[in-house]
From Swiss-Prot:
PANTHER family: GLUTAMINE-RICH PROTEIN 2. It comes from Mycobacterium tuberculosis (strain ATCC 25618 / H37Rv). GO terms for biological process: response to host immune response. This is Uncharacterized PPE family protein PPE28. Residues 245-469 form the PE-PPE domain. Pfam families: PE-PPE, PPE. Belongs to the mycobacterial PPE family. Gene3D superfamilies: alpha/beta hydrolase, PPE superfamily.
């Protein structure tokens, strides 16, 4: 198991790098190896000069020939040993180079300590929440320090391991002298290090690729920075092992912040994704440098991270091959045809720290993408002007998006493969059908009558919802899944098809309602025998009261009441900042986005397409329906979360 530096705070990683003697001892060792190499070269030249002088002089015959052969072997021994010493010096300098790079990339411990001291000071004086924005900013900076140190340590480990693989004991070097010529050609000189080391390591990995094991890097979703053992087990059993048998799955830390959804005072989505991408790319290269193949599992936010890392690796100077790297993604916001980030390309909300990145690349590395129908994050309607469909998708972010790990293997095996891809692709797309509309889940929670009423309206409501995806029969877009598809205005569906679907839905709804009503299970009346006894003398005797115990109880009650009031106040005013940020986005970014869409439509019309005028008006309206509905859902989620926290705080003091 390779070390996971990402689980260590910057206080630990920074202290490790900056403590100790630094690179001076390794530089001294490199100089010593250089001196030894120079002495061995001089000895070889001197011995060769002496023996050749004897041969060209008066010493002739068989004895002279035997001496020449023996001398040649010894000269070869000296020369090869000198080459070994030069190689050791080069490796020592390569280690120094790797260390210096890590040192430069690591946050200085004094900066980390100053950050923590500032946070402690602000928290101590944060009586009315006035310091909350400053605390959040410092915590965000601390998260950046964490990611920076983790990436630096991971890179240091990869580089140091590459150097260590080339080192061998002096005795082993001496024993290998008969084949010194080929060995000398493989050793990098001091001028070539550390790139010579990297090339040598990569050559060794390529030669042993057939024997490489596959390591699965499992990342959590938003709010799950460190996946639990159960999470890793389910990710492997349900999604990874089917396509990569024998994978060795292990958790990978990524920040997974999502202000203000996960925690109000939390890392923003953009910062979290950026840090996670650095960590994932470093972990992938670390495993590949160790001779392993890698398969990556990403869920929700970590699917976005995976999408970015795919593109970064493929565009790098030393990209992994498709045989070395693969991906499995679930609940992917960057789904080419359905991901919410792809439906609204390029939109950015600076106040919330959220930016829509591009679609997941489909032809870079072998990838499987699983999406649950009506998951509003990965399966957003193509035609958001359909308010019912958009509202259902927003409900799906709450009721469906978290269901990927409660599915059974049979449900996943029954997933619908989307095979109508365009052009060459390495990605396989799967849709897992959803029986019930998320929009009706609140109605289903009503006792007794909830399910019958939901089943009465669901067939027709599903037709309307599905029209938001383009086909009344499917709750997902049926156009090519590997083509990035932004939102549109109206689906091209015949009114006759819609009418037929509504007629069939009405019949099905009435039938389902009648069946449910005829099979209602009414709650039984309470059994009187279960009522508590009120007979005199029953129950536990009440201990006698004393003045001391009464005062102690009053002190405890006073302290608990004050703490609860403080917690309730903190939770209440903490919701003000995200509410203000949402309002900021709604009042600034959304109008700007509308103007952008309007101008695109006008440009389309000026180029001769009359639909541009329709789009100039319709696209802003469609975007507003989706964005304002999402903003309302987000605000409602924040209020519900705060309400639960307040209720729990109050219930703690109520007997």
């Amino acid at each position: 198991m390779l070390p996971n530096f990402a689980v260590l705070p910057p206080e630990v990683n920074s202290a490790r790098v900056f403590a100790g003697a630094g690179s001076a001892p390794m530089l001294a060792a490199a100089a010593a190896w250089d001196d030894l190499a120079s002495e061995l070269h001089c000895a070889a030249m001197s011995f060769g000069s002496v023996t050749s002088g004897l041969v060209v002089g008066w010493w002739q015959g068989s004895a002279s020939a035997a001496m020449v052969d023996a001398a040649a072997s010894y000269i070869g021994w000296l020369s090869t040993s000198a080459a070994h010493a030069e190689g050791a010096a080069g490796l020592a300098r390569a280690a120094v180079s790797v260390f210096e790079e890590a040192l430069a990339a690591t946050v200085h411990p004094a900066m980390v300590a100053a950050n923590r001291a500032q946070v402690a000071s602000l928290v101590a004086s944060n009586l009315f929440g006035q310091n909350a924005p400053a605390i959040a900013a410092l915590e965000s900076l601390y998260e950046c320090m964490w990611a920076q140190d983790a990436a630096a340590m991971a890179g240091y480990y990869v580089g140091a391991s590459a150097v260590a693989t080339q080192l061998a004991s002096w005795l082993q070097r001496l024993q290998s002298i008969p084949g010194a010529a080929s060995l000398d050609a493989r050793l990098p000189s001091s001028a070539e290090a550390p790139m010579g080391v990297v090339r040598a390591v990569n050559s060794a990995i390529a030669a042993n690729a057939a024997a490489a094991q596959t390591v699965g890097l499992v990342m959590g979703g938003s709010g799950t920075p460190i996946p639990s053992a159960r999470y890793v087990e389910l990710a492997n059993a349900l999604y990874m092992s089917g396509s990569v048998p024998g994978v060795i799955a292990q958790a990978l830390f990524t920040p997974q912040g999502l202000y203000p959804v996960v925690v109000i005072k939390n890392l923003t989505f953009d910062s979290s994704v950026a840090q996670g991408a650095v960590i994932l790319e470093s972990a992938i290269r670390q495993q590949i440098a160790a001779g392993n193949n890698v398969t990556v599992f990403g869920y929700s936010q970590s699917a976005t991270i995976s999408s970015l890392v795919m593109a970064n690796l493929a565009a790098s100077a030393d990209p992994p091959s498709p045989d070395e790297l693969s991906f499995t993604l679930i609940g992917n916001p960057n789904n080419p045809n359905g991901g919410v980030a792809t439906r609204f390309p390029g939109i950015s909300f600076p106040s919330l720290g959220v930016t829509a990145t591009g679609a997941t690349p489909h032809n870079l590395y072998p990838t499987k993408i699983y999406t649950i129908e009506y998951d509003g994050v990965a399966d957003f309607p193509r035609y958001p002007l359909n308010f019912v469909s958009t509202l259902n998708a927003i409900a799906g972010t709450y009721y469906v998006h978290s269901n990927y790990f409660i599915l059974t293997p049979e449900q996943i095996d029954a997933a619908v493969p989307l095979t109508n891809t365009v052009g060459p692709t390495m990605t396989q797309y799967y849709i897992i059908r959803t029986e019930n509309l998320p929009l009706l889940e609140p109605l289903r929670s009503v006792p007794i009558v909830g399910n019958p009423l939901a089943n009465l309206v669901q067939p027709n409501l599903k037709v309307i919802v599905n029209l938001g995806y383009g086909d009344p029969a499917y709750g997902y877009s049926t156009s090519p899944p590997n083509v990035a598809t932004p939102f549109g205005l109206f689906p091209e569906v015949s009114p006759v098809v819609i009418a037929d679907a509504l007629v069939a839905g009405t019949q099905q709804g009435i039938g389902d309602f009648a069946y449910d009503v005829s099979h209602l299970e009414l709650p039984l009346p309470a059994d009187g025998s279960t009522m508590p006894s009120t007979a005199p003398g029953s129950g536990t005797p009440v201990p006698p009261l004393s003045i001391d115990s009464l005062i102690d109880d009053l002190q405890v009650a006073n302290r608990n009441l004050a703490n609860t009031i403080s917690k309730v106040a903190a939770t209440s005013y903490a919701t003000v900042l995200p509410t203000a940020d949402i309002a900021n986005a709604a009042l600034t970014i959304v109008p700007s986005y509308n103007i952008h869409l309007f101008l695109e439509g006008i440009q389309q019309a000026l180029k001769g397409d009359p639909m541009g005028l329709v789009n100039a008006v319709g696209y802003p309206l469609a975007a507003d329906v989706a964005l304002f509905t999402a903003a309302g859902g987000l605000q409602l989620l924040i209020i519900i979360s705060a309400g639960r926290t307040i209720a729990n705080d109050i219930s703690a003091i109520v007997p």
